Amino acid sequence: QADFSRVRAQMEKVRTDPTTPDTRLSDNPNPFNPATPGALVQQMVGGLTPRHGCPLHARVRYFDPVAGRPGMPEGVGALVEKLEADSMTVTLVNTDPTASRDVVIEAGAYAEHQFTGVRIDGRETAIGDTSLGVHLAPGAGATLEIDMERYVNAPTFAFPWDR
């Protein structure tokens, strides 16, 4: 709710800006930026919004292995439902009704954590790695209960498929 209030307040500042285009500096819109990623960071990666150049501390990070880039594949959503000291629960959903999607989940924002196991629909699988792959059928979702050891690996910017 706080994030939505901030967006509304920022947009009101834009609408009531008394300056004219010919007197406005090029960076004038910066104080009015309505982007508010806090809730998205908390709900998708289980982290806190980084402030003032600080690194992102998060439980997971997502990659699109087909596009070879960081981030979610098109049409895939994630919701972190629960965080414990050594585990988390996240639900992934593929909103595309006709195409499947693959997602790589990394342990931490920089692979600093280690996945030890995952439970999906009651089936448990041991992992022992900094990432895991999930295949989502068209229009399907999955709730993953992931066990992890936190801050046991040296952080890296390398993509999961380059390690």
Language model region names:
Residues 76, 111-117:
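A broad structural signal for short, well-ordered beta-strand segments within beta-sheet-rich domains
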Residues 101-102, 154-156:
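A short, polar/proline- and glycine-enriched secondary-structure boundary/capping micro-motif
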Residues 84-86, 107, 114, 152:
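Extracellular/surface-associated beta-sandwich interaction domains
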Residues 116-153:
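Intrinsically disordered, low-complexity Pro/Gly/Ser/Thr-rich segments with frequent PxxP/GP/PP motifs
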Residues 155-163:
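Glycine/proline-rich low-complexity spacer/linker segments in large multi-domain proteins
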Residues 93, 108, 147-149:
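Solvent-exposed residues in well-ordered beta-strands and their adjoining turns
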Residues 96-111:
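Surface-exposed beta-strand/loop patches in extracellular or lumenal glycoproteins
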Residues 1-89, 95-98, 144:
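Catalytic domains of carbohydrate-active enzymes that cleave complex glycans
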